[in-house]
Amino acid sequence: MKLLARTLYLWEVGRQVASWSLTSGQECLVLRETWWASMRAVRTRAVHHKPGHCIAMGRIMRPDDANVAGNVHGGTILKMIEEAGVIISTRHCNSQNGERCVAALARVERTDFLSPMCIGEVAHVSAEITYTSKHSVEVQVHVLSENILTGTKKLTNKATLWYVPLSLKNVDKVLEVPPIVYLRQEQEEEGRKRYEAQKLERMETKWRNGDIVQPILNPEPNTVSYSQSSLIHLVGPSDCTLHGFVHGGVTMKLMDEVAGIVAARHCKTNIVTASVDAINFHDKIRKGCVITISGRMTFTSNKSMEIEVLVDADPVVDNSQKRYRAASAFFTYVSLNQEGKPLPVPQLVPETEDEKKRFEEGKGRYLQMKAKRQGHTEPQP
């Protein structure tokens, strides 16, 4: 079968220049199966893929993609994941004749950073649509890193994203999603369970959206106030889609930066993103808004730190709209020594009743995820 591809950035002879390529249809299936075979992992395909239901993208990691430790910034990886997700979901939602739309990111499920990615390696991002409801699309994304000198590849990230199609004529109008065809009825039922679970969790998150991070003067070390941090960012054209709304990947990268600052202030060592709990996008952010991204420590185990990150948007040029909560998530960071081995972290000292409550909630999430990992029997690549 012919390769249906569009090259977005050309390779320049003799130079390492970033490139993206989009592949659809059966060629994408071949790429995905080849990657998984190279890692000795077998993955059953979830749906019957038609052209546009699966894409593969690749880009070489440059020095400006690095964090202060020299590895690829976790926010950069999150941004690449979201770019793949928005392409495939927008393409699918416009696959039938009807009102044109753009897919908006509503939620990112828990994302684990399985292995660091290095500058000079090639990031391979593959995305596929695995479930559709009446008004939402589930996209599963895998990220592989390739050392182009040795040819070795490794799985670095897995993520599940949910999108909703918004009309180009009226961005407050959610359109219907074209259905996909499943190989087995069980796969559709499993997808429906995932949809209902994330829908319930999103509702629970909205109930907690009244929290505000307040600065404290002269806080004591190891307290929540000591490491809490904020970034203020004016949303410009380069942050937005063609329709004037912030890319979800831009928001996620800013959230990861704030979480990293909080973690570094708390332990004062090299830190890396270990995982991201579900990121919920509660409302759209328009061009021209001033966004405040605030992070605070909620829980520490022996070698990990949980940081809650909140994104508030202030439409400064629109007096009719007040400041609102746009997104929220929990990030988990680990402290590393010079050899890249995990270090014990200073234990958080919660002071107020709210801080103690958040600490216990974080402990519950930590123990739940620890039990899930210990009971996970799927062979790892």
UniProtKB/Swiss-Prot annotation:
Keyword vocabulary terms for this entry: Acetylation, Cytoplasm, Fatty acid metabolism, Hydrolase, Lipid metabolism, Repeat, Serine esterase
Domain HotDog ACOT-type as annotated: residue spans: 51-169, 225-339
This protein's name: Cytosolic acyl coenzyme A thioester hydrolase
One of the record's GO cellular component terms: cytosol
Post-translational events: The N-terminus is blocked.
Region feature (Disordered): 343-381
Active site, per annotation: 67, 256
The protein's role, per its UniProt record: Catalyzes the hydrolysis of acyl-CoAs into free fatty acids and coenzyme A (CoASH), regulating their respective intracellular levels. Preferentially hydrolyzes palmitoyl-CoA, but has a broad specificity acting on other fatty acyl-CoAs with chain-lengths of C8-C18. May play an important physiological function in brain.
Sites bearing N6-acetyllysine, chain numbering: 169, 199, 284
Enzyme nomenclature, EC number: 3.1.2.2
Record-linked CDD domains: BFIT_BACH
Domain writeup: Both HotDog ACOT-type hydrolase domains are required for efficient activity.
Tissue-level expression: Isoform 1 is expressed constitutively in brain and testis. Isoform 2 is induced in liver by treatment with the peroxisome proliferator.
PANTHER family named among the record's database cross-references: ACYL COENZYME A THIOESTER HYDROLASE, CYTOSOLIC ACYL COENZYME A THIOESTER HYDROLASE
Subunit-structure text: Homohexamer.
Subcellular location: Cytoplasm, Cytosol
Recorded catalytic activity of this chain's protein: hexadecanoyl-CoA + H2O = hexadecanoate + CoA + H(+); dodecanoyl-CoA + H2O = dodecanoate + CoA + H(+); tetradecanoyl-CoA + H2O = tetradecanoate + CoA + H(+); decanoyl-CoA + H2O = decanoate + CoA + H(+)
Annotated GO biological process: acyl-CoA metabolic process; coenzyme A biosynthetic process; fatty acid catabolic process; long-chain fatty-acyl-CoA catabolic process; medium-chain fatty acid biosynthetic process; medium-chain fatty-acyl-CoA catabolic process; palmitic acid biosynthetic process
